[in-house]
Structures are given as structure tokens and as C-alpha cells.
Amino acid sequence: MNFRQEKFVRFQDWKSDKTSSDVEYSGKNEIQTGIFQRTISSISDKFYRSFESSSARIKLFKRSYKSYSFKEAVSKGIGSTHKILDPQGPFLQRWNKIFVLACIIAVSLDPLFFYVPIIDDAKKCLGIDKKMEITASVLRSFTDVFYVLHIIFQFRTGFIAPSSRVFGRGVLVEDKREIAKRYLSSHFIIDILAVLPLPQMVILIIIPHMRGSSSLNTKNMLKFIVFFQYIPRFIRIYPLYKEVTRTSGILTETAWAGAAFNLFLYMLASHVFGAFWYLFSIERETVCWKQACERNNPPCISKLLYCDPETAGGNAFLNESCPIQTPNTTLFDFGIFLDALQSGVVESQDFPQKFFYCFWWGLQNLSSLGQNLKTSTYIWEICFAVFISIAGLVLFSFLIGNMQTYLQSTTTRLEEMRVKRRDAEQWMSHRLLPENLRKRIRRYEQYKWQETRGVDEENLLSNLPKDLRRDIKRHLCLALLMRVPMFEKMDEQLLDALCDRLQPVLYTEESYIVREGDPVDEMLFIMRGKLLTITTNGGRTGFLNSEYLGAGDFCGEELLTWALDPHSSSNLPISTRTVRALMEVEAFALKADDLKFVASQFRRLHSKQLRHTFRYYSQQWKTWAACFIQAAWRRYIKKKLEESLKEEENRLQDALAKEACGSSPSLGATIYASRFAANILRTIRRSGSVRKPRMPERMPPMLLQKPAEPDFNSDD
């Protein structure tokens, strides 16, 4: 309360003093002089105190920035409530790329101001293209918006405290005051100099209010403003480009875009040099006019060289003093700028015409390193030609080097494939492999290239984090695994475990995946192609069973029985079938160790429903079931035939017994005997046509061995 009263009384005292001083000023000059002196002294004291406080703040900022601690960064970062952008975030990375392109476009638009001056050859005066100056100013203002947005983003972009970098990535400073101090002490001045609308002010404000020789000097000022404003703009592009390549690794996503970007930089330099050539051509002609005016008797008025309706005219003597179409180097040597004056581009208001002509001049001389330039003795003209030659050499070598780098990145895989193919051919020739093996090797390499494009998928996936690798494998394999009916009953966790351990494999046509009697080391899930499986029941004579496998089928189920058996030995199971690829096959392989791990870790794999699914889709169980049904059918047919023959024999015996008392067989006995003999012959023919050579009666037919029953019961 006392503080408020004191403050209120002070305000009243100051007000009353001010009122009394006004009265004294109206009556006494001495008091006025004293009050003025006191006012000046108070202002100087305030300025001195403000200067001391600002210098103290700057020193405090330097000390605080150097000693910015980890605890302060954490506390300020947690306490901040405003939106602070992460310099490593995706938004700023995209914005930096956009801003780099905007800076390059802005640099390409600034030379448009050089096309504003034009020459009126009829009046021999210097004029201005009104349409061009408005267009250049509008385009320049549009690109300046990106600079303003970049400045705003810089005040909202955090930074990593230098003292916190020992803690991994470091702590992001989110204090708005510290961010502003850091930006004001680094790139703020450069950004402000780059965004100042100085060319627009010269074109739209200064030049319209000046006439005569002053306007010529103003055009020179425009030239120097645009030229020197190039410095902060170019200085700002390079660190931004380094920042973009440091955070994201690349500026363009594709090699062709990178090559086009470097070509654009070369063409941009051609455009800039062409614009300077246009402006310097006008400068040289105006210099010739001024010298002619000074030599004229009497000397002409220099303001007549400016195209003004009130003063223009009377410059016909310049046609003889500064000849263009029939140049005279004795009077004035235009040097490399004579072509621009003779072509009429400095007089034309057709912007596309003079733009493309000047662009072609810049591109031609950059590419030829300035060898065709015939300069005069004017020193700045020689410097301009030397700069063109050096810039052309540097830019052309830079363009060729970067284009070669970008284009080589597109053919690296092809070159690697050619080298591998050449090495394979040399190795096959050295080992004297037969032609059929060579064809199979070439076919496999070609098919592998078509499927993978030379990318080592396993190595690529192994370098990724586990969760990302699981998601990628799930995206690639899950939809294909669900085509296998056996996996439809499994839950998500088990499918993720299987997807993580599946390995893509490729097989060419007529290649053997596994042979009967070989150990089975992997379970194969077919995704594309067609296979043939054959079994001979252990090499049994006369036994052959074949099946076709396609997309969604699997083979190597013996490995699943081995993996589910907790008491199985380390020896791998033996394959009961031969599997051969009939065409190019793409599949996923599950190795024995991986299947054993999944079976031991996930007890939900043990279920009766999975047992029935396994039996239904297993080729081994299908073959055994078919052989079992065939054997049962043969037993049934044989039993039925025996019963039929026995019945016929009984009828014959009955007929013979009834006629035993007679001397000759009756007609009925004869019919029964002939029918019995016919049935016997028919049976013999049937059995002979079905089985050749005929097996002895004492050897029963061998059945296919029943597959081992997988242990789907969990051991609790």
C-alpha cells in the first residue's frame, strides 16, 4: 500500500512540476534555459544508464551461453509452454529443403532487375521498361516472403545446449529468450540484409522521382545494390545446404533429380552472367555517350541522355560518335558488349527475346570457358571476362563431377551384376564345368537379379531395429503365410515369430530342392511357382507316387514332427520324397533350428485342431492315406472274388452230386461246369492285366509306412 501511495504522489509531483515549469517558461527565459539544461542532462544520464545496462546484458548473455548447464536446459525446457520446433524434426527438414530451393529461385530472379533499363536508339537516350520493373518487383517480393518465414521459424527453433552433448543427443533448449539471443548473434544480420527490399525501393520509389544525370547514377546504385545483396544470399544458401545434407543425408530423393539440380545450377549461372552482360552493355553505351557529350562543341546537357518527354531529343550526333552497326574502335571500343548492341536486345521490350539471347550468350561462354571473348582495353571488362572463364571452369568441372556421381549411382547395381557375371564365367571356365551346369548357374543369377535387383535383403533387414524388422517381415510374409491353410489357425504372436525367422529363397527350373533319403534341414512354404514331389517308398520296386505343389503348399513336414518332439535327437529327419521345381519358384524357408525354437517357445502350437490341419494338408499323410485306401480296396475286391468263386464251386458240387447216380452228366451239370470255368478264366485275365509280373501268392503286398505322429500335446 505504501508503495502505491508513493508512486501516486510522485506522479502528482511530476505533473505539478511540469505545470509550474510551463508557467515559468512563459515568463522567464532564465528558468527556461535551466530547465532545458536539466532536460538535456537527464536525457544523457538515461542514455548512459541504458547503454550500461545493454552492455551488461550482452556480457551476461555471453557468460550464460558459454556456461549453459544441463540442469538449466532441462528446467527451461520443461517450463516452456510455447511451441518450439525441433531442428532435427521432419517439419524443419522439409522446410529447409523448400527454403534452399526458394533461395536459389530468388537468386535467379534478382538479375531480372538488370533488364529494366532499355536503350531508345531513335532518340539515343536511356529509358525504363515499366512492365519489367513491376514484374521483377512482384517476383522479388514473393520470394522475400520465404525469407520472412524463415526468420520467424528461426525464432521458434530450439538448439542443443553445448554442455549437454555429453548426454547422448543432448538437451533441446526451448527457452524463447535464449533462442532469440542465439539467433540474433549468428545469422540474423545476414538474413535481414538478404531480405531488405532495396531493389524494389530503387525501382519503384527513387527512380520515378529523379531526372537527368541523377537517374543514371540511380541505375548505377541499383546495379551495386543487386550485386552486393547477392553476397548475403549466397552466404545463406551454403550453410543451409550443408544443414540439409547433414540432417537428411540427401537433398534430392532420386539420382535423376540430383543430376537435374546440378544442371539447374549451371544454367542459373548462365542466366546471371547473361543479365550482367546485358546491363554492362548498356553501361558501356552510356559511357560512350557521356564521352561524346564532353567532346562535343558546345558540350551537350547530360540530362538529355535520359528519356524524358520534356528533355529528350537532340542527340543525333551520337550516331557518329558512338557507331554501333559499323563500329570504330578508334572512337570507342565496345569489346565483348558489341554483340548485345548490334543484335538490338538492349532496345527491345520483348522480354523472352532478350532473356533467351542473353542466357544463350552466358551458357555459350561458360561452356567455352570464355575463349571466344574479344575484350577491349577496359579493365573492368577484362575482369568480367576473366571471371567468366574461371567460373566456367569451376562450374563445368563441378557439373561433370556431380552428374557422373549421380548417374553412376543409378548404374551401380548393374555394374555389380556385370562384375559378378564375369567372375562367374571365369570361374566356370577355370573349373571346366559342363554346359548344362553353366546354363543353370546363369539362369539362377538372372532370376535372382529379376527378383531382388541386386539388393541384399537379408543384410539390409539385419541392420534395422527389431520392431521395424518385424513389421517389414510381417508386411512381406504375413499375407503369403495366410495362404497356407496350416497357418490360418495360429495366433498373431506365433505368426510374428514365424515371419521374423522366415528367409526368402529362389529356385530355378529343374532344380532339386531335396531328394528322397536326404536329411531335411528346412521347411519350405511356396509363394510362387510349381513343384513336383515324388516318393518310391524307400526305393521299393513298382511303387511310385507323385503330387504337384503350388502357391500356398508346403513341403518338409518331417521337420515339423521332429521339432515338436521334445525327446527328438539332434539328427535331422530323413526326407521321404524328392521335390523338384518345374518352373521358377519363390518361397520362404524356415530352418530347422528356427522351427525348433518356435515349437519350444510357443506351446500354443500344440493343439488338436492344428493336428487335423497338418494331417489334411500334409503330402506325406495324403500319400499314406491314398495307399491305405487302395490296400483296403484291394483286400475288399479279393475277398469278394473269393466268396463269388466259393459260391460257384458249391453250386457245381451240388449239381454234380445230384447227377452222380446217372451214367452221363446232365445238361444242368454241363452248364454249371462251363460257367465255373469261364469265371475262373475271367478272374485270371483280370488279375493278370492289373499286376504284371504276377507276384507269388505267399508274398503279401507291402504298404507305405505310416508317417510319424507329431506330438501336439503340450507338456505341462
UniProtKB/Swiss-Prot annotation:
Region ranges (Disordered): 689-716
Residue positions binding a nucleoside 3',5'-cyclic phosphate: 486-610
Keywords: Calmodulin-binding, cAMP, cAMP-binding, Cell membrane, cGMP, cGMP-binding, Ion channel, Ion transport, Ligand-gated ion channel, Membrane, Nucleotide-binding, Transmembrane, Transmembrane helix, Transport
Cytoplasmic side: 1-97, 154-187, 242-259, 401-716
Transmembrane segments: 98-118, 133-153, 188-208, 221-241, 260-280, 380-400
Family statement drawn from the similarity comment of this UniProt entry: Belongs to the cyclic nucleotide-gated cation channel (TC 1.A.1.5) family.
Domain notes: The binding of calmodulin to the C-terminus might interfere with cyclic nucleotide binding and thus channel activation.
Protein name: Cyclic nucleotide-gated ion channel 1
Organism: Arabidopsis thaliana
